[in-house]
UniProtKB/Swiss-Prot annotation:
SUPFAM superfamilies: Nucleic acid-binding proteins. HAMAP family: PriB. It comes from Citrobacter koseri (strain ATCC BAA-895 / CDC 4225-83 / SGSC4696). Homodimer. Interacts with PriA and DnaT. Component of the replication restart primosome. Primosome assembly occurs via a 'hand-off' mechanism. PriA binds to replication forks, subsequently PriB then DnaT bind; DnaT then displaces ssDNA to generate the helicase loading substrate. Belongs to the PriB family. This is Replication restart protein PriB.
Length: 104
């Protein structure tokens, strides 16, 4: 089954770094996406805030460059996580992260 998502946007919540009891580092943040997409011949505003989690040592170095306001592209897979309040939320598990050059 295919499960791939590529999403670019702006980091809108400060990254939270944790290490699991088994020693695996995790970095969590929220990515806000805004764009104009074409659907059925019409332009529409597309907007979402997607929680992102980066797990493992491979991508942790780049997470130290990520702050609120960073523009990035994330590629990975999506999965549901159940919150402490019992509600489920969709989360993007990052496998590749690329900083978008602001051109400044």
């Amino acid at each position: 089954m295919t499960n791939r998502l590529a999403l670019s946007g702006t980091v809108c919540r400060m990254p939270l770094r944790k290490v699991s009891p088994s020693g695996i580092p995790h970095c969590q943040f929220v990515l806000e996406h805004r764009s104009v997409q074409e659907e059925a011949g019409f332009h529409r505003q597309a907007w979402c805030q997607m929680p992102v989690i980066v797990s493992g040592h491979e991508n942790q170095a780049i997470t130290h460059s990520i702050t609120v306001g960073s523009r990035i592209t994330v590629q990975g897979f999506i999965s549901c996580h159940k919150a402490k309040n019992g509600l489920s939320k969709m989360v993007l598990h990052a496998e590749q992260i690329e900083l978008i050059d602001s051109g400044d």
